[in-house]
Amino acid sequence: MQQTIQLRKFAARSATAFLLAVLCGYPLYIDKFSNLGVVKFTGVCTLSWAFCLWLGALLLVGAVPRSGRFSAKDPTLWALGAFVFTGFLSTVLSLSPVSSFWGLGGYYGGFMMVLFTAAGYLAVRAFAPQGLLNGLTFCVGITTAIVTVLYVLNIFNIDLIGAYEDTAIIERAQFFSTLGQKNFNSGFMAFALPLVFYAFLVARGVRHTILYGVPAFFGGLALAVVDAEGLALGIGAAVLVLMCQKMFTTRTLRRIAVIGAFFFFHAGWMQYMRSHFYTQGGKPMLAALGHFGLDGFLICTALWALLRFGLRGREIPLWRAGRVVAAVAVTGTVLLYALANFWPGFPSLGRLDDVLIINDDWGTYRGTAWRITWCTWLDQPLWRKIFGVGTGMMHTAMMEWAGSDVTDRMKTFYAAHNEYLEQLLTTGLLGLAAWIWFIVSHLRKAAKNWLRPGVAPVTLALVSYLAHAVVSIRVSMIFPEIMLLFALLQVFCLPPESDALPAEKTHRGKGKKAKTVRPEPVAKPGLVRTWAPPAAAAVVMMAVCGAASRVIFGFLF
């Protein structure tokens, strides 16, 4: 019994290191831009298989998962199996099975990525401890701050590590982040910022407020600089979900006002820098609010002061009002899009037309990507509509569909810029249905266990990413993190777990009453002792696996 508990604890520490490596170390793993996609893919693939094999070895020698981690009646496990199986079918029936297996026809997101992310999901779900949220969130906050600072440096053409020394200026302007494509940065921020902001929203006491406030400060900077409309969509969706929860009070709104002040401060500063100094890359949608940076900062500060001093510490529930605001916002947005696109006589709304009217130019030509992806799927035979053209084969299928009518713009699209449309084309109706089943089964379980520690922030992070996916790409730089968050969500949804305490001992002296001796409570290790070993293991494993991936997957380079 004791050996099983010790092995389980060791496996839990290993799972913690795995999460730190993928969520915090892997986003900082970079190389020359020319091979960025395959470098990221092979690095995380090697890392995931290494940890999964290690945890599998611990399982074989007696590290049994806790009771309740897996159940034959759990729909989330069946949904995972359906997701993997439909990916397998689409790969076998692909236009090019080899390319689909490795994802060489797209953004290195083939069936191999489905396999190692599913294995990572099962490993984390089996052994990840329930009490890791605070430390994990803080580490994600540190990574967020580093990513944001490097992103800003490259906007001003400052490249600290020389990752682009062999790259043309035009490429630097298009992919201006030191950490690679803006799709990676926006996808990373889409799930990282809700974790960072939520930790700040619920922090109690001066120490924890400052501890989580610093990453939140850099999170406000990320909102002001990351060039991706999808990030605004994802964070907006997470905020709407948060407003509908019963935990939404005046205290929550007060902390949101602080985050708003952070954002407007950075947006105003970036607006000044862009107008007075050379910058490269695009300008985010939210950055337009930099024109009102000072006004927004003052309004947020005034709101914070009103809620802080006017209510004198009282917390008033706002979730009913929040649900009304969320319903009005969603209904109004849907109505505006419907009128702008389907009512010919709808009046122009000026610059908002660029956002509301979906055509080929919409969203930096995302409208073109959506149209050609949808038309390519419609033109497939029935069996391909059901099973798909193969994972990662969007570009190949589209080129065959377009034929001689292909345009230079169409040639640039290697993804649909909508994960759900791409899932429909590449894995067919079955694959899309399996993925939606996987998502819905997890979110339903989260809704039933919202008040359990850890469920709310991870759910908000996933909601943000899933909304972001409507206008983005499933890249190998982000999808492994998302699958691990789905696994972590299931761990947090479980009832509180604890190891069995040592049995009480009874001593009976001669002629005396029995005396019960209770065991001494086990002292919990400090923060450094708890997190230093898994953090060090995460860094070492990322470095080792990154180097080993060049040897193991050398044929892909």
Question: Positions of the model-derived regions?
Answer:
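Signature aromatic-anchored transmembrane alpha helix within multi-pass, membrane-resident enzymes
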Residues: 137-144, 213-217, 515-547
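Interfacial loop-to-helix junctions that mark the boundaries of transmembrane helices
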Residues: 37-46, 71-73, 105-107, 283-293
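Transmembrane alpha-helix boundary signature
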Residues: 59-72, 90-102
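Alpha-helical transmembrane segments of multi-pass inner-membrane proteins
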Residues: 6-29, 48-61, 81-84, 88-93, ...
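Membrane-interfacial, low-structure loops and terminal tails that flank and connect transmembrane helices
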Residues: 1-9, 68-72, 310-321, 497-532
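Hydrophobic alpha-helical transmembrane segments in integral membrane proteins
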Residues: 339-351, 540-557
